[in-house]
Amino acid sequence: MDFPDRRVPWSEALSLLVPLVAVIVPLARMLGTGATTMEEGNVLVVASGILDGRLPHADVSYLYAPGSVWTVAGAFSVFGTSVVVERLVGLGYRLLLLWGIHRLARRWGLSTAACATLATWAVLAPFGLIAYPWVAGLGLLAAGTTLVLDGEDRRTAAVGASLCGLAVFHQIVLAPAALLVVVPAFLSATDERRARLGTGLVAGLFPFLLHMVLVGPRAMFEGMVLDPVVRLRAGRRLPLPPDPNDSGDFFARLDDLVRGPSRFPGLDRAAQVAALFWLLLAATVILLVVAWRWRGSARSRLTTMAVVGAALVPMVLQRPSPNHLKFVGAWTAAVCVVAIAEPLGGLLGRLPGRFSVKRLGRSVRHLAPPMALAAVLGGLALLAPHHIGRFTVDAFTDRPLDGSSATVVHDGRTLPVGRGPGAKAVADEIDRLVDLVDALTRPGDRVFVGPVDLTRTNYSDTSLYFLLPDLVPASRHIEMNPGLANRPGSGLAADLAAADVLILTDRFDGWSEPNASVVPGDPAPAAVVADRFCDVGGTATWRVLTPCADPGDR
């Protein structure tokens, strides 16, 4: 019996191996970096809460489509609840994204595919491995797009459309991009292929129906649409266009303050954000024009990639922060490599004299993709040496876990805090804090983590919930978001009144952004704390409060 030869050509293996090595190099560091951000803590707490019966949107405020937390919860149920498991899920989403980019770009050659993949990874790597909904959805969208475009057989097309639907289930703002992939393919397909595409898309969107049955249509609509689009927006929106003299994002401002003046020549850090914003918009428009006038191979494929990039831009328009620019730029950078490498290869092939293709064969043309990659990443690093250059270099060159890496271990949960003397001090402080809370509570008691000033709910230490698995979050507001937790009618005051212990900090009281986050909200939650709770101890950063035994204790 004859079997088909399934050996992978060495050139294809090499084009996959190079990006894989680029992923492996910073992997140990990424798995061990601090997990103390509100965003990652929220993923950990919401996903682990699903296993305890607390559902996103119904029992916990959650601002995204629920796909990523359901996936992380599934991983927790199989492999145990840990930061490493959550980050391995995040790694899986990133590998899916890189595979999708590679397969999309391989139509223009394996070298182009490898370089486009490297461009995406270089832009995205500084964000780490958080199983963040946007990255998860983008990975599914990239994989779905390439399977829809390549899916000559019915099964591949159906799987691709299903992945596009799942991308929306992970991040609902990707719906326009997913439709821009599936609808043109549907309109140009045969009746049989249309049926497969339609079936696949419905299958990918079907988890929405299951989630709605569990949480109810109202809770689902409020969580995915009303809260993030209407209630939250005024408190998270940043000025458009970005101010080149002021980093509007709070953590970018804090980074400017902590690091001091830049050691790199060129634009100031705030101006770098503004420059990246304008560059992203310009690149998006130019890519659309290039795709429209494309004379090379696979014009429809490049057009789809450019159109998807344009559909991602609203993510930046709502909040032009460094992270949002990178989320969208990770896709755009890859398309730029393709758009530069293909015509550049043709130009190199036509060089006269000793550089001609007749003398060197096709080897000269193979230089085009690396040159395109160098042009894209080099241009970004020159334009934004701090936000792109420094963070990307640090992601690939910083040491992995060593003796100075600090972690907190409590109740079977391990939380990486960071590295260095400062991280050790923070870890020790958190350790003392959770030990105190344990001494004051019993399993099943209700705990709340938030700011001292509850009229301004801009950020919180959600990772503390993760370290206290025997306690139940007292409020559906795990994250502290302006316009949500501090709005009248949010239910936060009633939640606090029923809490058994509060963990409050003033370290985010200096939060300042050019939006409604600086405007005080409902005073009722703060009044509940003032009237009913007494300070019983804590640390320099966090105070622990429990219900007063007697009103006179105040």
Residue ranges and their predicted role:
Residues W10, I101-V123, G139, R155, ...:
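Transmembrane-helix signature of polytopic, membrane-embedded enzymes
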Residues M30-T33, V69, V83, R87, ...:
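Aromatic- and kink-enriched transmembrane "portal" helix at the membrane-lumen/periplasm boundary
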Residues W121-A125, A157-I172, A177-V183, V202-A203, ...:
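Membrane-interface alpha helices of multi-pass inner-membrane proteins
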Residues P176, A311, L317-R354, R359-L373:
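Hydrophobic/aromatic-rich transmembrane helices and adjacent perimembrane loops
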